[in-house]
Amino acid sequence: MASTFTATSSLGSLLAPNAIKLSSATSISSSSFGRRHNVCVRRSRPAIVCAAKELHFNKDGTTIRKLQTGVNKLADLVGVTLGPKGRNVVLESKYGSPRIVNDGVTVAREVELEDPVENIGAKLVRQAAAKTNDLAGDGTTTSVVLAQGFIAEGVKVVAAGANPVLITRGIEKTAKALVNELKLMSKEVEDSELADVAAVSAGNNHEVGSMIAEAMSKVGRKGVVTLEEGKSAENNLYVVEGMQFDRGYISPYFVTDSEKMSVEYDNCKLLLVDKKVTNARDLVGVLEDAIRGGYPILIIAEDIEQEALATLVVNKLRGTLKIAALKAPGFGERKSQYLDDIAILTGATVIREEVGLSLDKAGKEVLGNASKVVLTKEMTTIVGDGTTQEAVNKRVVQIRNLIEQAEQDYEKEKLNERIAKLSGGVAVIQVGAQTETELKEKKLRVEDALNATKAAVEEGIVVGGGCTLLRLASKVDAIKDTLENDEEKVGAEIVKRALSYPLKLIAKNAGVNGSVVSEKVLANDNVKFGYNAATGKYEDLMAAGIIDPTKVVRCCLEHAASVAKTFLMSDCVVVEIPEPEPVPAGNPMDNSGYGY
């Protein structure tokens, strides 16, 4: 304790000069202080400089044409990736090697056009891809192509003198009615069809489809499947049982298996402390209970200081106690949330002084139970005993609600991570490739496939290959009869014509005439009949495994219609005038030309 007081007194001496300076500051005269104050006030009003804006009015239709040019440039670029025979897009990277991608939303995010009005058009239609990606995780290219179709057909009729307000109202009502029709066409996905859904989304890669289906079968349809970048050229799948996080044991002296350098305990008790453990005396009651009960105990705390840690290690080495300790995962508020999650999984109570719980008075009632704990130098896995499943399910629902409210992607990612850890079984797919460029492209495809499979589980499946959207076009005539206004009916007709765009583009990318393909498909009354672009055959697409998740098709339709409505209602564009680049000043020390 003497050293502590010494440190404190020396700290006081270090602070003394500052104190003198502060007291001398008070001796400044009121007049000089006033002058200083006035100067400060003047400085606190920075000059406000507003960038000039350029206004583009749509008097002769040029503004809308420019916006549409931006839409078409983005849609044509993204469109080359659509379908089983779609090609890749190479993206330049300022740092590192170029990226080769087949993912619509990734391509769309990279596009910045030189003309500011065209760029706004591209940004408008990019929203359809981004929103579809956020909600369904796939179908981004289809959203862009469908939005292009709505806009192209809509611009024609608006240019001919139709009222854009009534036109967009007709598009909105028709899209809403078609979503209801889509639900009637949908069917629940069978386990055997999950692989087909994933394979179609991964560009007809059946190996990826089978792996995702296997992962789903191991952890259940509502289980958690995550992706990692693998170290080899092959794809791998493994399942992590229990809650796993990136924190290892504090001291290697806790190790029970010297070959693996790991700590393994069965039927282990857990003590959770949301503060630093500074004194070993605070742990005496809990440790004596563990010795009497003969059970192993795992301590998870913010930190364990040297004195307390030494006591734990000595008792472990003597064989008196089966014990291990680690620092709580996460930092700040997230650390407390992780501790609460562990408490719910194991049935423990977190020791927190703010809720009236102190460590020195803790007994058996605050301890949690785990059927198994495994600690390595860098990782800890806790497998619950299954008695707290109801509480875990409630916690997962709470976290899902937080995800819906979260605005930042990073926050959503961390919340999804917590759900994955709580769910008790996480399937991990390691994506392998020969090069880094191939790995990034492959990972995007597998991510799309995984998202499509999850979407299929949520809302069911429909026939793929763009055929469902084409079949929905035949439902538009009945919807038109429910619309009272003639111009709203024109809006419905716009939707009808645009619904064929995705199928035509899939056919075009496969080297076939899209109009001929759509006519042949519509000539057959069987709703499952369509064009298989991968094989070039007309067949029963459901039997051939060409399947789309209903949720993906619904999101494509809704978001494309929403973007088209915004576009067609626009009549003026405001853009910033870029500031001229400053002319570099000459070097005042440059004496060249003066004979030196």
UniProtKB/Swiss-Prot annotation:
Residues 1-50 form a transit peptide. GO terms for cellular component: chloroplast; chloroplast envelope; chloroplast stroma; cytosolic ribosome; mitochondrion; nucleolus; nucleus. Residues 388-489 form a coiled coil. Involved in protein assisted folding. InterPro entries: Chaperonin_Cpn60_CS, Cpn60/GroEL, Cpn60/GroEL/TCP-1, GroEL-like_apical_dom_sf, GROEL-like_equatorial_sf, TCP-1-like_intermed_sf. This is Chaperonin 60 subunit beta 2, chloroplastic. The keyword Plastid applies. Assisted protein folding requires ATP hydrolysis, but not K(+) ions. Belongs to the chaperonin (HSP60) family. It comes from the Eukaryota.
